[in-house]
Amino acid sequence: MIRVTSPTKMDDRQLNRLIKRVLLLLVLGTIVFVGFYALDRWRPATEPIVDRRLSAAEQAVRDKPEDIASRGQLADTYVAKGRYEDAIVQYNLILESDKATEQATYGRAGAYMGLGQLDAAATDYQAVVDIAKGGEMAHVDSMLQASYYSLGSLAMQQGKPAEAIPFLEKALAIKRSDADALYLAGTAYVATGETDKAETVLRAAVAFVPIGWSEPYAALAEGFTKAGKTAMAEWAGAMADLAAGTPDLAEPRLLAIVGGDAAVDAAIGLGLLYETKGDSATAAQWYARALEKSPENAPARLGLGRVGAGGAASPLPALPEPGAPAGGNE
C-alpha cells in the first residue's frame, strides 16, 4: 500500500525538500528544451556563394578541359576571389587556343590591374581596342568602351592627363551616360586647363549622380578657380559639402551667393538640399526661384517636377554619412 503524506501534516523540512525537487525538475526541463530548440534551429554554416561557384567551375574544367566557356568562368571567378595569378594562367590557356581572344585579353587585363602591373594591363586593354574598334558593333561594344575607359584611367594614374583625354572621349562616344568616364574626363580637362570642356562633362556627371558623390563638384570647384570664376567655385565647393553628407556646411555657403553671379545654380543647390531633407515645399520654392531667372533650366525643371507643389515625397536617395565612400555609376 502506497503511503501518501497529507500536505497538512508536512513539516517545514519536508516542504522545503519538495520545493527544491520541483525547482530542480523545472530547471532540468528548461535545459533540455533549450538544448533541443537550439539543435533544431542550428544549421551548418553554408559555403559562400563565390566559393561554391569556384568549386563548380574548377570541377567543370576538370571534367571538360577543352571547354573554353568553363575555363573562362573559372578565370573570372579567380579574379573575383582575388586570385589574380591563377586567373592569368587560365586566361593564357584560353589565348593559346585562339578562341575568345577579346574576352580573355580583357579579363587578363583586369587580373594585371589587380596585381598592380599597370603596363601589362595597358598592353592588354590596347589589344582589346585593336581587336574591337573595327567591328560592326563597335559603337555599342561595352567591352571596347570599358577598355577605352581603363586606358584613360591608367593614363591619369600615371599623371598623363593629355594622353588620357582621347581614350575617355572615345569611351564617352560609346556610352555618354557613363558618369565615371564623365568625371575622369573632367579631371583631365581641368589638369590640362580646358576649363570650359571640364565644366560641360562634370555638370553632366553630377546630372546623373546629383548627391552622394562629391568628387565631381570638387573638380568643378578647381576648374572654376582656374578660370577665375570665384562665385561658381564657391557654389561647386558648397555642393561638394552637400554631396559629402554635410548639408549644414553647404547651406550657409549657398545662401551667401544666391543673390550673385551663381544665383541660379545656388538656388537649384538649395532646392536639392531641402529636397534631400524631405522638405518638398521649401525645395519647390528654391527651384521656382531658379526658374524665374532661367525659365528653361533643365535641372530646376526636373527638381520642381520631382517635388511638385511641395507635397510630393522626394525620390532622391538619402545623403551619405560624412566620410563614407561614394562613386558614380558603373
What are the functions of these language-model segments?
Residues S70, A104, M137-V140, S147, ...:
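TPR alpha-solenoid repeat register
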Residues I2-Q73, T77-N92, E96, T123, ...:
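N-terminal leader/linker segments that initiate helical-solenoid repeat arrays
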Residues P65, K99, K133, S142, ...:
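Short coil turns that delineate tetratricopeptide repeat
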